Amino acid sequence: MRLHLITVGEPKLAYARAGWDEYEKRLRRYHKVQVTRVGGRTGAQASEAIARAAGRAPLILLDPRGEQFTSESLSAYLDAQALDGRGELAFAVGGPEGHTDDLRARAHRLWSLSLLTLPHDLAMILLLEALYRAATISAGEPYHRGST
């Protein structure tokens, strides 16, 4: 399955760029990965750009109003989407203003990485690490050591 990762802007901090690069490389061993960076001076502009970038793919917005996954439940969700014949899922990290209500209404799902407020750069790394961890769980590989 192809995972389309959409972010507003580039990681700005060196640790974030390094983390993004590392987990993107790891994730590519399990999935086709497409990365799209969009711009937008306002939340509305960024949300419009995210919607255009996602196209017809089911859109999963990282949003504090969303549900939380365990690593195992994220793995199961991704496996179920693949079994249902979805060739692509789009995941979007919004900008500083978050997502618009219109984009939230269009989304296939809202996913909250944490109850904490996270810096944009850190949210991007957490997204990639969570997807990578889910892929290793599905593959039965030893990266994940949590309990099921």
Curated annotation (Swiss-Prot):
Key words of the record: Cytoplasm, Methyltransferase, rRNA processing, S-adenosyl-L-methionine, Transferase
Reactions this protein catalyses: pseudouridine(1915) in 23S rRNA + S-adenosyl-L-methionine = N(3)-methylpseudouridine(1915) in 23S rRNA + S-adenosyl-L-homocysteine + H(+)
Coiled coil segments of this chain: none
Chain positions recorded as S-adenosyl-L-methionine binding sites: 62, 94, 113-118
Compartment(s): Cytoplasm
Predominant place of localization: cytoplasm
Gene Ontology MF terms in the entry: rRNA (pseudouridine-N3-)-methyltransferase activity
EC number: 2.1.1.177
Subunit structure as annotated in this protein's UniProt entry: Homodimer.
Homology family: Belongs to the RNA methyltransferase RlmH family.
Protein name as annotated: Ribosomal RNA large subunit methyltransferase H
Organism: Deinococcus geothermalis (strain DSM 11300 / CIP 105573 / AG-3a)
Gene name linked to the record: rlmH
